[in-house]
Every structure is written in structure tokens, then in C-alpha cells.
Amino acid sequence: MSKIVKVLGREIIDSRGNPTVEAEVHLESGFVGMAAAPSGASTGSREALELRDGDKSRFLGKGVLKAIAAVNGPIAEALIGKDAKNQAEIDQIMIDLDGTENKAKFGANAILAVSLANAKAAAAAKSMPLYAHIAELNGTPGVFSMPLPMMNIINGGEHADNNVDIQEFMIQPVGAKTLKEAVRMGAEVFHNLAKVLKSKGYSTAVGDEGGFAPNLKSNAEALEVIAEAVAAAGYELGKDVTLAMDCAASEFYNKEDGIYDLKGEGKKFTAEEFNHYLAGLVEQFPIVSIEDGLDESDWAGFKHQTELLGDKIQLVGDDLFVTNTKILARGIEEGITNSILIKFNQIGSLTETLAAIKMAKDAGFTAVISHRSGETEDATIADLAVGTAAGQIKTGSMSRSDRVAKYNQLIRIEEALGELAPFNGLKEVKGQ
């Protein structure tokens, strides 16, 4: 019934016009699972390797034919005849066959696409939605929740061609009673933000994740215009809508002199000074979550940041932890941050992703399920968020189909599950 008979890889295009890996897993019963690997722009140095061809004559060197060859060759040969329901075994076969610490032989993009396609095929064979199958794989059958969205409505850093150093300024519609209402509130703030930006003569062009990407006078001004938009939409900042930021600080950290350089506003900080700069923003605005507030290697700085802010707000490690249980375990032991961002292409398989979520939750950390800046129409992260009852999701703004596809899938899931999947809002955020 669920025996694998065919594994197929192909090169498709992501939301930035770059190639990525799409995989199909076909079962004896006729069921097929299909999934695509996302791709990041601001990437942690310890992420699993995304295999690119390096052939400058194709896609400026970003082709993925080597990864596709791995899917259609050794991966397919190893998986044909195996039972798709045994997700951990399927993933381990690919990991062992690759044989490297960071999946450098086949590429995390190849292994992940097959891993997710396999999960989808197995779910179909069991006649159950993907989120329900994921809950079973997670050891929490029938336990679901709808995630609170973090909506990235102003894009900066590596996600935009502007002068804003901090990469993401997000809203969380915490006053919503349902996911669908949260999406509506986010859309209303997004459209009002467009009006606010236009009234100030700013651009309303969008960045990689569908948020606006204007040139602004300062990072604080991004929070100020969002505050105006929230009020214009008829909501109360801090009560109906809270704020979150992803600094992606590794992108503006100068390793040689240990300085955080906000070039957009001509300010330079040591780690301790930047922590106090962030603390000042938290005092000024209802910011409840900050991600990657320092460089991924600045563990001493993160320790200070956690002591300064960790009992007040959620501090999320993305480049810091790269969805890796070995690194997360160190963070938990040393008391670094209190939350992890979950990006399954950072680690390269569904099984390892579930392990990271479990480790975080067991330690009292929160887990925020996340997209990448290079996405496709694949909406698997919506099912992952619901099926693990993670509680929070970060999947961009209210424009671009590669972002909206995830929100639409969440709306469908909420409709199907009803009261079986509660929307807990701000209660999901660490420290709130």
C-alpha cells in the first residue's frame, strides 16, 4: 500500500527566480507526494548545505542539476521498495547515504524535498491530511493548534534593496480570536501601511517576503510608520497588535572589530551597546519578540541580551541555532535566548526538524515555524505549524502568492479542524 515505487526530482523556479529542487514520491497504491525545497538569503554559516551547480552558463551558477541527479539516482535507488510511512527510516537512509555532517554530497535541498514529498505521500496513503500525519510522526496524534502569525510588513536587510539594516519588522494580530481573523487584521494593517508610506512620499515596492521596502530615516521609523498604520486600521497597538523584529544581525556585524554597524542611520555599537539599543526600542514600542539580535557566533553577547531582555520578551535564535539540535542543546544549557526559529531546510529533513521542535518545547523554549526568503507555492510549513502545535508561524506579508499560499492553507486547516485547533494568540509568545 505505502511501498515506494518511484522517486523523481526536477528543477523548478522559486520566488526569486532561482532554481530549486522539487521532488515526487510515488507509492505502489498510486498515491503521490510532491514537495519543493525553499532557499534563504541571510543564511547561518552552520546550515546544512544547499547544493548549487556553480555552472555560470546556467542560472548564473545557481542551477540545481547536481541535487536533481542525486534525487533521481542514488536517493531513488535507496528508497524504492521502502515503506513511506516509516519517515524516520526514510530520512536516515538519505542522511547515511550522503555521509557528510552538513548534507554536502547530495545537498539539503535534495534530501529535504524528498523527505517532505515522502511525508505527503504517506499522509495520502493513510487518507489523512498532512498536518494529522505530522502530528502522528511527532508523537502527538490529534493535538493541534493554529499558529499566531508574525507578518513581515516592512522588509530590510538582505530581503530588500533599501537602507534599512534590520531585516524584518513584523506585526502579530494578538487581538484576533481565530487564525482567519488574524489574517484579516494583518491585511488591513498592510493596506493602511501602504497609505501611510505614500503620504510620506515613501516607496510601496515590496521586498522578497512581500513587505514594503522603503528607504527610511532610521530603523525606529519603521516601527513608527507601522504604529500609524495599526491606528489607521482601527486597532490598538499593544492590545490588538504587537510588534516583532528579526535583526539578522550577522548581516551587519563586522567580525574584525566586533562592531554592529547600522549603516542606514550611521550608528555603530558593541554587542552590549546594541543590546541596550534594542532594549530602548522595547521600552518605546510594544515589541514582544526579537530574532537574531546579535551575530550567530556572539554567544557572550547573547548571554547578556538574554539577561537583559529574556524575562520580558521572546528572544528567537535563527542563524544562532540553524534548527540543529546539537547547537540548540548548547543554547539551552547555557541559557541563551528562549526560543528557536524552525526552518526545515537549515537541517534538511522532516525527522530532524521534529526533533528540534521537541527539544525546544521540552526545555520550555518556544518554536516559531518559518518560511525562507526564497519560497515556492509549497505550503508544507502551514501543516507543520498545526501538526506540531508549535503556536507561531513566520511566513511573510500580505502580498506575493509564495507567502499568501501558506496563510490560505492555514485558513483551510482551521476550517477543517474547528475547535480541535485552538488559536491561542499572545499566550504562545515566550514571556507574554
Swiss-Prot record:
The reaction(s) catalysed by this protein are:
(2R)-2-phosphoglycerate = phosphoenolpyruvate + H2O
SUPFAM superfamilies tied to this protein: Enolase C-terminal domain-like, Enolase N-terminal domain-like
User: What keywords is this UniProt entry annotated with?
Assistant: Cytoplasm, Glycolysis, Lyase, Magnesium, Metal-binding, Secreted
Q: Which SMART domains match?
A: Enolase_C, Enolase_N
**GO terms for molecular function, please?**
magnesium ion binding; phosphopyruvate hydratase activity
Concerning CDD domains, the annotation shows: enolase
Query: What's a Pfam family in this record?
Result: Enolase_N
Query: How many cofactor units bind, and how?
Result: Binds a second Mg(2+) ion via substrate during catalysis.
Could you say which enzyme class this protein belongs to? Answer: lyase
List the GO biological process terms.
glycolytic process
Active site as annotated:
209 (proton donor), 343 (proton acceptor)
Q: Which residues bind Mg(2+)?
A: 246, 291, 318
Q: Which parts of the sequence bind (2R)-2-phosphoglycerate?
A: 167, 343, 372-373, 394
Q: In which pathway does it act?
A: Carbohydrate degradation; glycolysis; pyruvate from D-glyceraldehyde 3-phosphate: step 4/5
Name the EC number(s): 4.2.1.11
Q: Which cofactor is essential here?
A: Mg(2+)
**Major site of localization recorded for this protein:** cytoplasm
Q: Which GO terms describe its cellular component?
A: cell surface; extracellular region; phosphopyruvate hydratase complex
Homology family:
Belongs to the enolase family.
Q: What does this protein do?
A: Catalyzes the reversible conversion of 2-phosphoglycerate (2-PG) into phosphoenolpyruvate (PEP). It is essential for the degradation of carbohydrates via glycolysis.
* NCBIfam families for the chain: eno
Subunit-structure text? Component of the RNA degradosome, a multiprotein complex involved in RNA processing and mRNA degradation.
List the protein's name. Answer: Enolase
Q: Which organism is it from?
A: Aliivibrio salmonicida (strain LFI1238)
This protein's gene is called: eno
